[in-house]
Structures are given as structure tokens and as C-alpha cells.
Amino acid sequence: MTLAVKVPLKEGEIVRRRLIELGALDNTYKIKREGNFLLIPVKFPVKGFEVVEAELEQVSRRPNSYREIVNVPQELRRFLPTSFDIIGNIAIIEIPEELKGYAKEIGRAIVEVHKNVKAVYMKGSKIEGEYRTRELIHIAGENITETIHRENGIRLKLDVAKVYFSPRLATERMRVFKMAQEGEVVFDMFAGVGPFSILLAKKAELVFACDINPWAIKYLEENIKLNKVNNVVPILGDSREIEVKADRIIMNLPKYAHEFLEHAISCINDGGVIHYYGFGPEGDPYGWHLERIRELANKFGVKVEVLGKRVIRNYAPRQYNIAIDFRVSF
């Protein structure tokens, strides 16, 4: 039995709102109709209303996290990851060594809690090689690797086993989009399947989107059609071999972007902006990268104005993924 306010049907919605305002509505029980009256569950007696005891059906609460239902020994629960990536309908999780034996149980719990997730993979290696891919080990759900991911109002088709993609950069991509101006020419030097390129195409006159991974370019071409954009030019190859002039350059290859910086500066128009990404240590994550930028500015005889810099996320213990935006003037 629980407490409920008894009100005529026609007054039900008005009373419900009033109970919410008073903090009295008990959402753990369902409202029940009884003849021409409603029984609205409350946490405590409310002055001015008829309060009765009633048998009401409890609202079944779905767990908020897989951690609430996963079956692992109590002494190992502290090792359970608190976050993982969801790309389209595929979840990718890093499982610590202590829990590798419970990988399938963790996968099962993720599928049960996240109804949109159809497949779960465990990271089997770090991101490696020229194509920036990693080994993925299937632990639950369907054995699929191709999906369509939605972010920032665009759709991105991709294969998580064949291309690099991080949903954690969605906010960063929107930040760059908001900085972009109408009618620009953009050079996305490491475009992947197009999360920057296709988003920026909404403002740009033209986007040159380059990647060395043929699978990335294949999906980029599909995503151009999927999003009905006609101003993105996909280019397969090393971006250092692409001779273009651009008002805005995206350099999202944190581990190696510094090796492409000289070419980026040679491609930028007067007054153009370069969005540079790198990895840096705790304490001074920007120093080495800023020094490199200034060295090349001196070499080219151009002026550099740093517009902003920020830590995007932790990459490894005491290592950060950073971004530096700078304007180049001749």
C-alpha cells in the first residue's frame, strides 16, 4: 500500500502538475484510474487534498548502467570500466586484464541496458599503423562491424574494424564548425570517413578531404551521398602530396600532425586558420607543439597568432590530446 491523492478525472492533470511543484509526486508508482477518480501516488500527505492508501503498480525502473546488472565477483567490481564508446549501434569497450575472463558477461550487460546496441567489441590492441585501426574482439550481440553513426546533424557510415573514428570528438568537431565562416575553402588533411568534412560542407564553398586509408575514402564517398553534399572532394593519398590553397585546415592526426605542419603552412591562405592536434605531457602539453609552429613560421616568414588552445581529453596516464588553433598572416 502507498499514499495517493484521490481526485476527479477532469482535475487529474492540474493536480498532477501541482504535486510536481510541491515535490510530492511519487514517480515510483503508476497513476491508477478508479471509476471517475484518479489515484495519484504521493511521497507524503498533502494539505488540501484527499489522501488515501491504495494499491498501486510500481514503475519498473530500467538500470542506468551496465554496472548495475553485470555479474562479476564483488572484489572485481572496482575494475569495471565507467565508460565506453557507442558508434552507431556498436559498443567498443576497453576491459582491464583483471576482467578479461568476464568479457562476455560485460558485453551481455551492455546489450541488455542499451537497447540500441546490437554488437559489443572489446579492444584487442592499441590504435596502430598507417590506417589508425585496432584489433576488435567480439564479445556480445551480432557479429557486425558496419554501422551508421549520427552526430551533429549528419550521418556517417563506417566499418569500425577498417577505419578510425572517435565519437568522443563530436563536441570538438562542432566547436570548429562554429568557428568556420561561410564560403571558405577547407583542407581536411586526415579526413577519415568525413566527420569534419561533411559537417563543414554546410558552410564551406569547397572541402578537400584527404585520407591515406582506401576504406576511409570508400565510406567518405558513401557519406557524401548519404548527406547529399556536393562540395566535398574525396582524395586518396598522403596529404603532403596534395597541392591546394585553403582558408581553413584541419590537422586531426595527433600522433604525427607535426610531420605535416610544414605542408599545412604552405597550403594556407593569408589570414587562414589551422586547427592543429597533438599529444602532450601533463604540466606543459602545448610547449613542444607551439615551439614547432613558431619555428616553421620563422622559416616561412609568416606571422602566427594563437587563437586558442585546449585539452580535449586524457589520452594516456599524464598524456593529453590537445588542440591549438592559430591564424597565419603573410
Curated annotation (Swiss-Prot):
GO annotation, biological process: tRNA methylation; tRNA N1-guanine methylation
Positions of S-adenosyl-L-methionine binding: R173, D211, I212, D238, S239, N252
Keyword Cytoplasm: yes
Gene3D superfamilies, A to Z: 3.30.70.2580, Met-10+ protein-like domains (3.30.300.110), Vaccinia Virus protein VP39 (3.40.50.150)
Keywords attached to this entry: Cytoplasm, Methyltransferase, S-adenosyl-L-methionine, Transferase, tRNA processing
PROSITE patterns: SAM_MT_TRM5_TYW2
EC class (word): transferase
Disulphides: none
GO cellular component, one term: cytoplasm
Annotated NCBIfam families: tRNAMtaseTrm5b
Family membership: Belongs to the class I-like SAM-binding methyltransferase superfamily. TRM5/TYW2 family.
Job of this protein: Specifically methylates the N1 position of guanosine-37 in various tRNAs.
UniProt name for this protein: tRNA (guanine(37)-N(1))-methyltransferase Trm5b
Species of provenance: Pyrococcus abyssi (strain GE5 / Orsay)
